[in-house]
């Protein structure tokens, strides 16, 4: 029997006691016909059984140390021992008694202190393989459990027998360090997101900014702007962050940039967290040839140390001659022994961006053809290598040299084991390493790796900046052609660094005395693009290089970018450059256009100067079998057969890759003799 709502309405209006009406059970008190979900002819998802919803299978979450301890020991009581510190930052101490022994834990909240007390108790009767961390109280974020990478985020369905190993790999350093309880402000906060560091030890770029991450990791973080240099339109800010009385500096064109740089330096030093573009695995950036288990990245703290040492040395040597402090490119070479950066030495410092003018070419090797900073720094290193071989000429000083006798090798001398050289440049070297847009796909994979512009040999332009492909040049350079007005072209710095990674940085003359010396790392102050930089310095010929005589090989230096990147300098490049080598009493200022010092003298790092030093070594160095030196400089270089073979194989590799032909200076430049 159907019920008509009009009956109820009529009866309500009549208020007649003779017509009592009782509403059915499926009608609410407002008079609307709303059937229960069970009586409807169809089902709606939102009316699903609530009991079934509660029974939905859940993914098991990791247990913290309190839960672990409660499973192993029942009836434990946690007591609040004390509360110290200010109101806004209290420090709680909680104890738990297990098997008659009391264990303490401290934290910024009672919950954290209880977890630490439980962890201390667990460590007393469970033997761990290594020291380790607490498992997180909650997942770091929304996780994709279908992904193979979900284990890195700390969520894993493990049995209780394996949970102890998880505790070991996830405890904070504070628990493994007894003194940490005395210094709670230096310990990491307990709500740190684990997404910045993976469980397997491999680093990836954090998904948070350095300042935010630093505040999450440490409780006591203080930033301070301590210095502002430069004019209003080109100022430089210096920020310092203090963490547990340790200071870390950062510089930048704005306070925000400087603050980020300081935070990056602190994270790299204290947590080994790097924001370097080299952290992200690149498609075309394979591992170094000498270490297949490591990445192409130099540790960030080492890169920052190298950059800081070079900058400090530059400021030191320029004192008193501030007029020559103007520069666009700064370079330097740092030497380490056994990778001990605490005792690293700055071998050379240089500035410069120009090449010699064609009218100032020298037939006596008395001018510097290329005054670009990185090229000059390498020539300063040559000066240092000659000085170190000089020490071998005297038995009383031989032990001070970085070289040792190579009794069982084909070369009389070799570097001591563990000696490494690191090149710093404040920007990417000119040429192939700098042919990219820094704001387009900054660190992504190159979408056009086969584009014709990629990897091309390029030349510097006389009396100018920038480079052009060698295919656009006039080919062979002649002395009379240059004097008549043809531009004198010099190979780009990217190409020369690629050459050093085949034949070494010791030059052709020293190659008859010592084994090849290679750069261990290259650190840039700005404009580091992993793929472009790797391709420029070694990647473009790695598939085509062949036939190198041992011990010559393709060297793959580690790459890094400093945290305090240098801003783009729009000022006009000066026509001079400076150079300094360890042991020099003062710096040398060279006019880049003439290739001579500003006083018109011959520079101390010219071909002529090195040929004289080479002649002295050949006459006095112990262990030299053939001491006769050809009076012609070019012929002496040609007599170093293995070096020449390696160099020709390099040129052939570029040709096989269709990257152009290596452009040489007029041959007359090397046709000079050894001074009597």
From Swiss-Prot:
GO cellular component terms, A-Z: cytoplasm; nucleolus; nucleus
Enzyme class: hydrolase
InterPro entries per UniProt: A_deamin, dsRBD_dom
Active site as annotated: 374
MF annotations from Gene Ontology: double-stranded RNA adenosine deaminase activity; double-stranded RNA binding; metal ion binding; tRNA-specific adenosine deaminase activity
Chain residue ranges for the region called Disordered: 1-51
Enzyme Commission designation: 3.5.-.-
Function: Has A-to-I RNA editing activity on extended dsRNA: edits RNA-binding protein Rnp4F. A-to-I editing of pre-mRNAs acts predominantly through nervous system targets to affect adult nervous system integrity, function and behavior. Essential for adaptation to environmental stresses, such as oxygen deprivation, and for the prevention of premature neuronal degeneration, through the editing of ion channels as targets.
Name of the protein in question: Double-stranded RNA-specific editase Adar
Gene giving rise to this polypeptide: Adar
């Amino acid at each position: 029997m159907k019920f008509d709502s009009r009956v109820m309405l009529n009866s309500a209006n009549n208020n007649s006691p003779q017509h009592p009406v009782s509403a059915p059970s499926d009608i609410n008190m407002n008079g609307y016909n709303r059937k229960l979900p069970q009586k409807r002819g169809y089902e709606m998802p939102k009316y699903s059984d609530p009991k079934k919803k509660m029974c939905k299978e859940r993914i098991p979450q990791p247990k913290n140390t309190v839960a672990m301890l409660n499973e192993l020991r029942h009836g434990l009581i946690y007591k609040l021992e004390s509360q110290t510190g200010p109101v806004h930052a209290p420090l709680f101490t909680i104890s738990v008694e297990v098997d008659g022994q009391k264990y303490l834990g401290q934290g910024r909240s009672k919950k954290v202190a209880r977890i630490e007390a439980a962890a201390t108790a667990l460590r007393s009767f469970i033997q761990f393989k290594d020291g380790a961390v607490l498992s997180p109280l909650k997942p770091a974020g929304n996780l994709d459990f279908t992904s193979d990478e979900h284990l890195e985020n700390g969520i894993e369905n493990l049995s209780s027998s394996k949970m102890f190993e998880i505790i070991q790999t996830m405890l904070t350093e504070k628990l493994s360090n007894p003194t940490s309880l005395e210094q709670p402000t230096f310990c990491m906060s307990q709500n740190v997101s684990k997404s910045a560091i993976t469980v397997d030890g491999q680093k990836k770029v954090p998904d948070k900014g350095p300042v935010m991450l630093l505040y999450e990791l440490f409780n006591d973080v203080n930033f301070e702007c301590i210095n502002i240099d430069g004019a209003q339109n080109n100022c430089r800010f210096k920020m310092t962050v203090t963490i547990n009385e340790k200071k870390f500096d950062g510089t930048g064109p704005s306070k925000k940039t400087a603050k980020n740089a300081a935070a990056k330096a602190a994270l790299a030093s204290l947590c080994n967290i790097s924001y370097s573009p080299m952290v992200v695995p690149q498609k075309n950036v394979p591992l170094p040839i000498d270490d297949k288990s490591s990445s192409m990245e130099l540790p960030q703290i080492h890169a920052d140390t190298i950059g800081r040492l070079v900058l400090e040395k530059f400021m030191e040597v320029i004192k008193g001659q501030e007029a020559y402090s103007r520069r666009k490119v700064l370079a330097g070479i740092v030497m380490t022994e056994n990778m001990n950066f605490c005792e690293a030495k700055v071998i050379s410092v240089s500035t410069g961006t120009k090449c010699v003018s064609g009218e100032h070419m020298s037939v006596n090797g008395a001018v510097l053809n290329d005054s670009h900073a990185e090229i000059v720094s390498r020539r300063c290193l040559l000066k240092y290598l000659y000085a170190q071989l000089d020490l071998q000429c005297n038995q009383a000083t031989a032990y001070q040299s970085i070289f040792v006798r190579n009794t069982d090798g084909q070369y009389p001398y070799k570097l001591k084991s563990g000696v490494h050289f690191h090149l710093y440049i404040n920007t990417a070297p000119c040429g192939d390493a700098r042919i990219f847009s820094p704001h387009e796909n900054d660190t992504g994979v190159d979408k056009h790796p086969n584009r014709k512009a990629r990897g091309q040999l390029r030349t510097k332009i006389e009396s100018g900046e920038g480079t052009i492909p060698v295919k656009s040049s006039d080919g062979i350079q002649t002395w009379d052609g240059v004097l008549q007005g043809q531009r004198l072209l010099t190979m780009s710095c990217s190409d020369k660094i690629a050459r050093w990674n085949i034949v070494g940085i010791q030059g052709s003359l020293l190659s008859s005395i010592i084994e090849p010396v290679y750069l261990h790392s290259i650190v840039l102050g700005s404009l580091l693009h992993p793929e472009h930089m790797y391709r420029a310095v070694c990647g473009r010929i790695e598939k085509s290089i062949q036939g190198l005589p041992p011990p010559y090989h393709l060297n793959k230096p580690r790459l890094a970018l400093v945290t305090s990147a240098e801003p783009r300098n729009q000022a006009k490049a000066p026509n001079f450059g400076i150079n300094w080598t360890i042991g020099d009493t003062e710096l040398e200022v060279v006019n880049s256009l003439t290739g001579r010092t500003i006083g018109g003298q011959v520079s101390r790092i010219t071909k002529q100067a090195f040929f004289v030093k080479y002649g002295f070594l050949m006459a006095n160095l112990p262990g030299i079998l053939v001491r006769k030196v050809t009076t012609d400089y070019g012929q002496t270089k040609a007599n170093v057969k293995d070096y020449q073979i390696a160099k020709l194989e390099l040129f052939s590799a570029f040709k096989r890759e269709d990257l152009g032909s290596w452009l040489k200076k007029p041959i007359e430049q090397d046709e000079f003799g050894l001074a009597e």
